[in-house]
């Protein structure tokens, strides 16, 4: 049995047939929690086509109880997912380090900043200081947004100074770049990175 930090047990995702996956809408409305799956498929596409090498960081697990039925075998009876201290994804594109977090919300008017933790913000700041490309991909209001880390820090500092604890829909739309959904790649965030960080170098 594996538990998350909030005490809930881990439930494996149900298998989705290829036929159903092909019918997915180009809108994120009423889609459920699929952002991570779509990003993982996108990263597989980037890797297979030698575009970028981006991987999801494994969630750290704390093992609590191990049973040894045999000396040569060990069975994990109880474990907990530990809270990640950094971000979800990292890798490399055209020689630049890429580091980003993926977040979703069902809130219809704002994106709650409680989705982030202090140590994640500090990690992103450290990446930016080293000239890494750091950002957040946010699924909200039926769309997907690319928000640069520097823009996120502005909203975070406002919260830390007893200001608003969320990003309003209009604020997010003004500060971020919308990501058009496709089939392959599904969420083409590299095209935005190319425009922001590499088009001026050519």
UniProtKB/Swiss-Prot annotation:
The lineage of its organism: Bacteria, Bacillati, Bacillota, Bacilli, Bacillales. One of its GO terms (molecular function) is nucleic acid binding. CDD domains: RecU-like (cd22354). Its EC number is 3.1.21.10. One of its GO terms (biological process) is DNA repair. This is Holliday junction resolvase RecU. Endonuclease that resolves Holliday junction intermediates in genetic recombination. Cleaves mobile four-strand junctions by introducing symmetrical nicks in paired strands. Promotes annealing of linear ssDNA with homologous dsDNA. Required for DNA repair, homologous recombination and chromosome segregation. Its cofactor is Mg(2+). Binds 1 Mg(2+) ion per subunit. One of its GO terms (cellular component) is cytoplasm. The record marks 103 as: Transition state stabilizer. Mg(2+) binds at residues 86, 88, 101, 120. It is found in: Cytoplasm. Residues 1-34 are annotated as: Disordered. It catalyses: Endonucleolytic cleavage at a junction such as a reciprocal single-stranded crossover between two homologous DNA duplexes (Holliday junction). Residues 8-32 have a biased composition (Polar residues). It is an enzyme of class 3 (hydrolase). InterPro entries: Resolv_RecU, Restrct_endonuc-II-like, tRNA_endonuc-like_dom_sf. Keywords: Cytoplasm, DNA damage, DNA recombination, DNA repair, Endonuclease, Hydrolase, Magnesium, Metal-binding, Nuclease. Belongs to the RecU family.
